[in-house]
């Protein structure tokens, strides 16, 4: 069956957008709020009509992720680009561990469905919601291992709010990685279909 590289690239961009946001948070203590909102909202889409619907039905909101994906595919193994590649691959590894555990997947689904009650009272980007999302990551994903080593400014990373945002963003990255697998993504494509993925990202970016 032919792979749908459009859907695969969108889901990859979702993973990469989370990776870039984690990097921004770890180094600067803040991040692009619109890009963050996009990946966090994706967590709440449990029955989307399409891959794009997970992110809000517009390619524009994945611009950061598509640009980051191109950077990862360019295989720059230095500095910040190497960090992005490490985060992206680590999220993919964790997703495989999560998907292999039926009980963890069930718990994750239950915990995410419970967020609706809180969202009736709090904004998605509020400290309360960040804390709730972070606790889901700590309780459900972290025990599966291996831990994702987040590097940045030690002073910034000591902030409880930054820690919560980083974990919430990693959880959103896992959601995109689950989607990526569902639409036919695999790590082999990052080696053998690099050109095709790069061109697909370029093509989508041309419309944004």
From Swiss-Prot:
Belongs to the HflD family. It comes from the Bacteria. It comes from Yersinia pestis. The keyword Membrane applies. It is a peripheral membrane protein. Its main location: cytoplasm. Gene3D superfamilies: HflD-like. GO terms for cellular component: cytoplasm; plasma membrane. It is found in: Cytoplasm; Cell inner membrane. SUPFAM superfamilies: YcfC-like (SSF101322). This is High frequency lysogenization protein HflD homolog. InterPro entries: HflD, HflD-like_sf. Keywords: Cell inner membrane, Cell membrane, Cytoplasm, Membrane.
């Amino acid at each position: 069956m032919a792979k749908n590289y459009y859907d695969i690239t969108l889901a990859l961009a979702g993973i990469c957008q989370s990776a870039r946001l984690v990097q921004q948070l770890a180094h600067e203590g803040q991040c692009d709020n619109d890009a963050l909102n996009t990946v966090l909202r994706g967590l709440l889409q449990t029955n989307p009509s399409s891959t794009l619907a997970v992110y809000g039905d517009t390619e524009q909101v994945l611009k950061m992720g598509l640009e980051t994906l191109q950077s990862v595919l360019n295989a720059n193994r230095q500095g910040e680009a190497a960090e992005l590649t490490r985060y992206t691959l680590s999220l993919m590894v964790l997703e495989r561990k999560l998907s292999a555990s039926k009980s963890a997947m069930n718990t994750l689904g239950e915990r995410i469905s419970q967020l609706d009650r809180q969202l009736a009272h709090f904004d998605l980007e509020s400290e309360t919601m960040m804390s709730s999302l972070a606790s889901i990551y700590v309780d459900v994903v972290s025990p599966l291992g291996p831990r994702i080593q987040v590097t940045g400014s030690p002073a910034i990373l000591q902030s409880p709010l930054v820690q919560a945002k980083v974990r919430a963003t990693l959880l959103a990255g896992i959601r995109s990685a689950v989607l990526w697998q569902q639409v036919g993504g695999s790590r082999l494509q990052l080696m053998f279909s690099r050109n095709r993925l790069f061109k697909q990202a370029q093509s989508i970016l041309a419309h944004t």
